[in-house]
From Swiss-Prot:
This is Phosphopantetheine adenylyltransferase. It comes from the Archaea. InterPro entries: Archaeal_FAD_synthase, Cyt_trans-like, PPAT_arch, Rossmann-like_a/b/a_fold. Pathway: Cofactor biosynthesis; coenzyme A biosynthesis. One of its GO terms (cellular component) is cytoplasm. Reversibly transfers an adenylyl group from ATP to 4'-phosphopantetheine, yielding dephospho-CoA (dPCoA) and pyrophosphate. The gene is coaD.
Length: 155
């Protein structure tokens, strides 16, 4: 199958995997031949998360397992990122970036940084928000909060 882009990038913390992550990753596999996933380092995640995320090694293993289910035949590379941009600002091979509505401004910043470096901007694909049955936006933070509620811990 011929894909629209040879190299697609996306990034995130990928702490508690959920259907929003599946949508983000599946979108990347629908448009790109090779997928580069930037996974935040533990130290970088601690600068913006209000809770302690799972260790990098656990998040990476979970992400690899999920990608093997979504697109087992696809070439996927993983890179640990220590800032909001990762290799997206300097890798000239990258042609497209997939982002959520929440992270779309960061994708635009990345393209601005690429322009400053004389690189072509990437095409930006923004996925819509995924909501639970109550209309709440799904996120790892939201899921963690729900699971930590006292009523969630009752048998």
């Amino acid at each position: 199958m011929k894909y629209k882009f040879r190299n697609v990038v996306l990034g995130g913390t990928f702490d508690t995997l959920h259907s929003g992550h599946v949508k983000l990753l599946a979108t990347a596999t629908l448009i790109g031949d090779r997928i580069l996933i930037g996974l935040t380092s533990d130290s970088f995640a601690s600068t913006y998360k209000q809770y302690k995320v799972r260790p990098f090694s656990v998040r990476l293993a979970n992400l690899r397992n999920l990608m093997s289910l979504i697109a087992p035949e696809r070439e996927v590379a993983y890179v640990e990122i220590h800032d909001p941009y990762g290799p997206a600002v300097f890798d000239p091979r990258l042609e497209a970036i997939v982002a959520s509505i929440e992270t779309a401004p960061r994708a635009l910043q990345i393209n601005d940084e690429r322009a400053k470096r004389g690189l072509r901007p990437m095409e930006v694909f923004i996925i819509s928000t995924v909501r639970d049955g109550y209309g709440h936006t799904l996120s790892s933070t939201y899921i963690r909060r729900v699971l930590e509620r006292p009523e969630s811990k009752q048998s």
